Amino acid sequence: TVEALLAQKESRFYEALLPLGVYTAAYLNAVEGANYDVAKLLDWVFDGCKSPAGRTGWGIIVGKWGDYDVSGLQGSITDGGGYAFLMNSIKPAWPFIPMVKYQPQYAKAIGKWMLNNASACRLFYPGEIDETHQWAPELKDITYDNVSYEGLRKTDDYGKASLKGVSPVAIGDGPKWIKGNPTESMFSVYSSSPVGILGAIVCQTNVEGILRLDCNVTDFYTEKPYPVYLYYNPHKETQTITYQATQPCDLFDIVAKEYIAKNIKTNGSVEIPANDARVIVELPAGTELELKDGKIIANKQNIISYN
């Protein structure tokens, strides 16, 4: 439960449970009027676990390894200077992206993290990182670039001579699991299988560096009457994206609490402020909104903004 998480004196972050707890707390705050400390739970994720009684050193990685930006990946911050895992890097997107519908004040932070994370997740795939930075490039063709390496280490921990001084290294623990496990076991079906989460959420826009993130597709247990998308602009200037509508629509931003376009027929232009985010709800054109008890309600029945 959320109470069990918040009863901890410090972070116990490992893999997926704490990010799911963040979503649960945000949802219950919005929908049920709870008052859980979402900020504390988010800090526990991004600052990582420092307790010797937990998975010490587990967190969200920030920075560059060699020439590669690995910010946003999840794994050990301390093991050999850093050891990220693809499965763990993908999984937080599942709860974090829909979470911003309920706590839009975190849209910018989550949008920035997701942009970095989605970019860095490519580095686990043998067709997306150069051969000098992977442990078994001679075997990459067996993956068809659909199966990734399990992990990405800051430095090789097997002692392979050709990887001395190389950072990062796409790698896997398979050969360590049992004596005789082949090098091929560095490629990981369990790590690659959740990539559909990213495939469902992430879509490019006409502006490089700005992604359209679907806030509904992994929000599994709620009514979703309208499309909702998170856009984060990492640039120093306002950028104009092309919004592709599914119907004649009005666009309402629940971060700024304002309409940003009305009566779009097919494609429209939307401005995303510099270094900021929008969470855009696509409403059927002419939908009436009302403010009641701090909530914005569409057509007298669907809450689109909770605070």
What kind of feature is each model-predicted range?
Residues 246-259:
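Solvent-exposed beta-hairpin/edge-strand motifs
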Residues 264-306:
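C-terminal beta-strand-rich structural cap/linker in extracellular carbohydrate-active enzymes
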Residues 89-100, 104, 136-203:
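C-terminal capping/lid segments that line or modulate ligand- or cofactor-binding pockets
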Residues 74-135:
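Membrane-proximal bilayer-interacting regions
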Residues 1, 14-28, 80-99, 194-196, ...:
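Well-ordered alpha-helical segments within folded domains of soluble proteins
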Residues 1-13, 36-69, 112-129:
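Long, well-ordered core segments of solenoidal/helical folds
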Residues 3, 19-36, 46, 59-84, ...:
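Carbohydrate-binding/catalytic loop surfaces
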Residues 166, 171-247:
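Carbohydrate-binding surface patches
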